[in-house]
């Protein structure tokens, strides 16, 4: 089973679309802030979620990740796409919630990182391996890698989207 969580009107082909709106053509109408989701434990092979997570606050993100972990099979991957924290897209939409999302936001969803950060007491149970990629602004991909790295760490609107791949441990 492959899920497109928060699919809106752009459900990914080959995926079961899940959204809270009955008007967007989702296959499953469900509010993803309401737990449990209508899927069995360890039943999902792949997840896609584009521009949904930024609409959740911190507590909702923790619950979302724990529920994501519950429904995913061990070794399953989830691609989560959000506006990058230094892009105007992260803050322009009044329905986006605080805080904006960076790579470091995901460290809380890895058990070893929670230990290193001394936050193992947080109410988070999930444990994902993490990998990241980003969508660069037009023209940035043509710069040499050292200049790209400098721009990413010093300039706004260099990276538009963060693409996080979470693998269930």
PLM feature spans:
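Class I SAM-dependent methyltransferase SAM/SAH-binding core
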Residues: 2-36
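Conserved Rossmann-like nucleotide-binding pocket used by diverse enzymes
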Residues: 16, 28, 40, 48, ...
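A short acidic, Gly/Pro-enriched loop at the edge of an enzyme's catalytic core
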Residues: 33-47
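Active-site micro-motifs of SAM-dependent methyltransferase domains
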Residues: 34, 54, 108
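GHKL-family ATP-binding catalytic core of two-component histidine kinases
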Residues: 38-40, 57, 102
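S-adenosyl-L-methionine-dependent methyltransferase catalytic module, highlighting the catalytic core
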Residues: 60-63, 67, 73, 77-169
């Amino acid at each position: 089973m492959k899920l497109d969580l928060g699919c809106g009107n752009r459900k990914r082909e080959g995926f079961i679309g899940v959204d809270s709106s009955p008007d967007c053509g989702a296959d499953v109408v469900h509010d993803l802030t309401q737990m449990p989701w209508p899927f069995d434990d360890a039943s999902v092979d792949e997840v896609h979620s584009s521009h949904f997570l930024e609409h959740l606050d911190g507590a909702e993100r923790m619950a979302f990740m724990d529920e994501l972990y519950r429904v995913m099979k061990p070794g399953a991957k989830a691609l989560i796409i959000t506006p990058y924290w230094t892009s105007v897209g992260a803050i322009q939409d009044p329905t986006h919630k605080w805080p904006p999302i960076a790579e470091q936001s995901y460290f809380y969803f890895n058990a070893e990182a929670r230990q290193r950060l001394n936050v193992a007491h947080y109410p988070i149970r999930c444990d994902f391996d993490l990998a990241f990629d980003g969508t660069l602004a037009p023209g940035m991909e043509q710069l040499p890698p050292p200049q790209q790295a400098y721009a990413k760490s010093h300039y706004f609107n260099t990276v538009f989207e963060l693409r996080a791949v979470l693998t269930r441990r």
